């Protein structure tokens, strides 16, 4: 009875106690979620106070995870409509603080997906805002819900295999397709005649989808990047083939995917599905762009790099002593970043020594810095990086950490499963005295002074990501090395890993080549971008400032603009020097080809600028600046579309061609569009053209003349404004052209051919005259030869003598005094017998009066009949009887 009474008294007491405990348990079970929601609302409110496009009264929706994109890889994320617009509200997706999305993203409202393909210029973090609005009573859009998430675009890492970089939806597939650490990756690349910078994000994604349907390769395995420095083909390729494109018009795009690991010509998979369609045009018809060619090459295995780690600070207690263990930890809730968090305290002169603290999670390989100062070993929390702490540590404040490079060694610590590892870009200067320069103070650490480690308190917020750029930052923070050389090893010479080999350039076309980071490798300074590069000639001479090839050692960019005198092969040497003074050399050739279009360009652009042409012609930097400005005026980001033809006097007369125009048939519409873009119909430059070239070049007039397939057309200036496309352009060019292009055509097509024909006729006439005169100086005929006996001595016949002259007087002797006396005359009888007279009767009668009266005198010998003296002809011939007439016949 007493016991039953006691039970009756205890039952109400136990009931009340049980109800109290149950209510407390229920309160405890609901408390964390309420606190989480309250903390989340506080963070969202802090974000809404900063973002201009979101109102403070708009409730936030959590559920869109942050995304990661890689340059050249397709990105796709689906927006959950049940969380944003469950009641059919209007959804708006844009960049935070802007009205539109980033240039590489495309929003598809039908499938509620956000997709795109980033390029190298899109690297960084992009914050995307997704908001739902409803049409209000007054016609305005009233915000209902909103959400903000981030997309970080990582750069393309050439040293990492493609299978690892591929953003595959199945991680197991990525691991299974990955190659070994020392095994090269075989990649097939298709070269397209396309310009990714001119495509919209949807066009890039559609191109990948068409290639997927053609080649049956998944999107996450394909990579699409633009051509850099006109390097269309890979010199290390072991297989290659042509496409259907005869020439390259655009900048070019490379679409590639992985074939396997360490393949060669013997074990490469069947590529007939690429080889024949690329050559015959089937692939081009499917993709919508011309195919230039394809090649297969093996990519070298990656070089191990440091992995930057990010510690998720959590209040979870862990054991400070003993090896790291794996602790079960829920991933922290996503925190929307705000400019108000974290708070950075002002710097002071205190320094925090390295501390150690095991972080729970999956073990991974990280890097620990060994300094020159020996610290006292202590047991405490493990901190994997050296933290430069300023001021007193206050819970809730996050200090930016700075990684100090030095001698590193791997240590096994644990990181959370949700940790995102990132590769920092840090410089590695020479070992020096450890110092940390802040904006106001300089702190030096005493040598070998034991210091009690100060534990860094944990906070519940996410530490920001700190990037250390190699270029000089705007702040005065310097990163120095406090370590010593590794084991006192001597400095090793840099090694040449990949040759530059050959660089192709064209006359009048600007080119630039970025030296790849895997060209040289140094054991101390690592990749090529950490070395000092110098471009030299054969005789160890540096390239001069006036050379047509220039090299920027800071950006490691080689560029130039050759002219017609540089056609051929030129040998140069690239010297890579490490910080210890040791260097390696790579010899390569620059092949300069003739103009890509030659004289077949369909149009020639001429512009007249004010100034002296001599400084422009003699300064390679001014010529390159002119080409870049001309390309910018046409809206081309690729300067190789402009081919500089000539720079002459007459102020500054510049003539160039546009390589984007097809040669045949005549691209009349395209030329007219380009002409109207830069000049008016009367040849006056437009404001956009002038603004693009000023202040260095001030244009006064522009002329566009057809050539090649359009040689009969004149575009700028034109007589009437041509508004109807079907009008045929007039071939009668007015004389208002400042550069007198019409007169040049007249000289080229009329005057010069006429002069050439006249010269040919004149030369032919001179040759005919010479031949005629030589023919007249030939041998005499037989009749003419019988007329003369001796050359130059005339023959006088008897009937040609002049008998009218009187005979000579007998008083003048016929024999001169200096001559010898003749022989005595013969004895003649005294009788005169007519028949013995040696002369004829006429002669005796003629000379009879000349005889002496003395009968005993000898008979007179008459002189020869030629009595007239021969003036200037020398002596007479002695025997002339054969040419005299015979004496008359006298009968006996």
UniProtKB/Swiss-Prot annotation:
A motif (PPXY motif) lies at residues 886-889. InterPro entries: Alpha-dystroglycan_domain_2, Alpha_DG1_N2, Cadg, Cadherin-like_sf, DAG1_C, Ig-like_fold, SEA_DG_dom. It holds the Pfam family a_DG1_N2. Disulfide bonds join 179-261, 666-710. Residues 28-750 are extracellular. Residues 313-482 are annotated as: Mucin-like domain. Residues 816-892 are annotated as: Required for interaction with CAV3. One of its GO terms (cellular component) is cytoplasm. A motif (Nuclear localization signal) lies at residues 773-779. Keywords: Cell membrane, Cytoplasm, Cytoskeleton, Disulfide bond, Glycoprotein, Membrane, Nucleus, Phosphoprotein, Postsynaptic cell membrane, Secreted, Signal, Synapse, Transmembrane, Transmembrane helix. Residues 772-892 are cytoplasmic. GO terms for molecular function: actin binding; alpha-actinin binding; calcium ion binding; dystroglycan binding; laminin binding; protein-containing complex binding; SH2 domain binding; structural constituent of muscle. Residues 1-27 form the signal peptide. The modification Phosphothreonine is found at residue 787. Residues 460-482 are annotated as: O-glycosylated at seven sites with GalNAc. Residues 829-843 have a biased composition (Polar residues). Residues 30-405 are annotated as: Required for laminin recognition. The keyword DNA-binding does not apply. PROSITE patterns: SEA_DG (PS51699). The modification Phosphotyrosine is found at residue 889. It comes from the Eukaryota. Residues 410-444 have a biased composition (Low complexity). Autolytic cleavage produces the alpha and beta subunits. In cutaneous cells, as well as in certain pathological conditions, shedding of beta-dystroglycan can occur releasing a peptide of about 30 kDa. SRC-mediated phosphorylation of the PPXY motif of the beta subunit recruits SH2 domain-containing proteins, but inhibits binding to WWW domain-containing proteins, DMD and UTRN. This phosphorylation also inhibits nuclear entry. PANTHER family: DYSTROGLYCAN 1, DYSTROGLYCAN-RELATED. The dystroglycan complex is involved in a number of processes including laminin and basement membrane assembly, sarcolemmal stability, cell survival, peripheral nerve myelination, nodal structure, cell migration, and epithelial polarization. This is Dystroglycan 1. The gene is DAG1.
């Amino acid at each position: 009875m007493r016991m039953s009474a006691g039970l009756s008294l205890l039952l109400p007491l136990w009931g009340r106690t049980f109800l109290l405990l149950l209510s407390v348990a229920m309160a405890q079970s609901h408390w964390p979620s309420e606190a989480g929601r309250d903390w989340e609302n506080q963070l969202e409110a802090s974000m809404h106070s900063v973002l201009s496009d979101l109102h403070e009264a708009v409730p936030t929706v959590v559920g869109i995870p942050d995304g990661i994109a890689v340059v050249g890889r397709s990105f796709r994320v689906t927006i959950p409509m049940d969380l944003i617009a469950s009641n059919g509200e209007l959804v708006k997706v844009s960049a935070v603080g802007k009205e539109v999305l980033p240039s590489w993203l495309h929003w598809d409202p039908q499938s509620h997906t956000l997709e795109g393909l980033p390029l190298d210029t899109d690297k960084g973090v992009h914050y995307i805002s997704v908001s739902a609005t409803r049409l209000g009573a007054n016609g305005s859009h009233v915000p209902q819900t909103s959400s903000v998430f981030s997309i970080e675009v990582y750069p393309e890492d050439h040293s990492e295999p493609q299978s690892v970089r591929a953003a595959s939806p199945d991680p197991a597939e990525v691991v299974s397709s990955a190659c070994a650490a020392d095994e090269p990756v075989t990649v097939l690349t298709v070269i397209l005649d396309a310009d990714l910078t001119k495509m919209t994000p949807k066009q890039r994604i559609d191109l990948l989808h068409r290639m997927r349907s053609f080649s049956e390769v998944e999107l996450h395995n394909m990579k699409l990047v633009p051509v850099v420095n006109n390097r269309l083909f890979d010199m290390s390729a072991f297989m290659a083939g042509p496409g259907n494109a005869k020439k390259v018009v655009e900048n070019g795009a490379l679409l590639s995917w992985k074939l396997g690991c360490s393949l060669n010509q013997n074990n490469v998979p069947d590529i007939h599905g690429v080889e024949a369609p690329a050559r015959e045009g089937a692939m081009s018809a499917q993709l919508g762009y011309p195919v230039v060619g394809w090649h297969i090459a093996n990519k070298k295995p990656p070089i191990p790099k440091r992995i930057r780690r990010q510690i998720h600070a959590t209040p979870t207690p862990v054991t400070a002593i003993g090896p790291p263990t794996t602790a079960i930890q829920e991933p922290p809730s996503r925190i929307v970043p705000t400019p108000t968090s974290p708070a950075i305290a002002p710097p002071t002169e205190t320094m925090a020594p390295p501390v150690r603290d095991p972080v729970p999670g999956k073990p991974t390989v990280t890097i620990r810095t060994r300094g020159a100062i020996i610290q006292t070993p202590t047991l405490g929390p493990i901190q994997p990086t050296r933290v430069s702490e300023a001021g007193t540590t206050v819970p809730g404040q996050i200090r930016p950490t700075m990684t100090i490079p030095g001698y590193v060694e791997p240590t096994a610590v644990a990181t959370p499963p949700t940790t995102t590892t990132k590769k920092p870009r840090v410089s590695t200067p020479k070992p020096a005295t450890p110092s940390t320069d802040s904006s106001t103070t300089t702190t030096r650490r005493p040598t070998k002074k034991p210091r009690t480690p100060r534990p860094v308190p944990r906070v519940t917020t996410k530490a920001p990501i700190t990037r250390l750029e190699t270029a000089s930052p705007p702040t005065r923070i310097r990163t120095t090395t406090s370590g010593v050389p590794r084991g006192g090893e001597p400095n090793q010479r840099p090694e040449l890993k990949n040759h530059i080999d050959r660089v192709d350039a064209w006359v009048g076309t600007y080119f630039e080549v970025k030296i790849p980071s895997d060209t040289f490798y140094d054991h101390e300074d690592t990749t090529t971008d950490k070395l000092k590069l110098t471009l030299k000639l054969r005789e160890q001479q540096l390239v001069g400032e006036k050379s047509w090839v220039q090299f920027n050692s800071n950006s490691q960019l080689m560029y130039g603009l050759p002219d017609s005198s540089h056609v051929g092969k030129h040998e140069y040497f690239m010297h890579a020097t490490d910080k210890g003074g040791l260097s390696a050399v790579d010899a390569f050739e620059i092949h300069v080809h003739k103009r890509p279009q030659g004289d077949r360009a369909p149009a020639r652009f001429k512009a007249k600028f004010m100034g002296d042409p001599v400084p422009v012609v003699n300064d390679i930097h001014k010529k390159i600046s002119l080409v870049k400005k001309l390309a910018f005026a046409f809206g081309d980001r690729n300067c190789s579309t402009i081919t500089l033809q000539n720079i002459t006097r007459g102020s500054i007369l510049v003539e160039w061609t546009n390589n984007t125009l097809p040669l045949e048939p005549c691209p009349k519409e395209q030329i007219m569009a380009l002409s109207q873009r830069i000049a008016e119909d009367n040849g006056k430059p437009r404001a956009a053209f002038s603004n693009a070239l000023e202040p260095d070049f001030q244009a006064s007039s522009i002329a566009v003349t057809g050539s090649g397939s359009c040689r009969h057309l004149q575009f700028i200036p034109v007589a009437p404004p041509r508004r109807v496309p079907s009008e045929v352009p007039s071939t009668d060019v007015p004389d208002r052209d400042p550069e007198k292009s019409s007169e040049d055509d007249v000289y080229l097509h009329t005057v010069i051919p006429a002069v050439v024909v006249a010269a040919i006729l004149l030369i032919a006439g001179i040759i005919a005259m010479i031949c005629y005169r030589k023919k007249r100086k030939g041998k005499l005929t037989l009749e003419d030869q019988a007329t003369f006996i001796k050359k130059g001595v005339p023959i006088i016949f008897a009937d040609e003598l002049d008998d009218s002259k009187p005979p000579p007087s007998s008083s003048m002797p016929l024999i001169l005094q200096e001559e010898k006396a003749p022989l005595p005359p013969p004895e003649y009888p005294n009788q005169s017998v007519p028949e013995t007279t040696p002369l004829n009767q006429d002669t005796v009668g003629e000379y009879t009066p000349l005889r002496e009266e003395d009968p005993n005198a000898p008979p007179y010998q008459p002189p020869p009949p030629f009595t007239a003296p021969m003036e200037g002809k020398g002596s007479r011939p002695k025997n002339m009887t054969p040419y005299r007439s015979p004496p008359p016949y006298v009968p006996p």
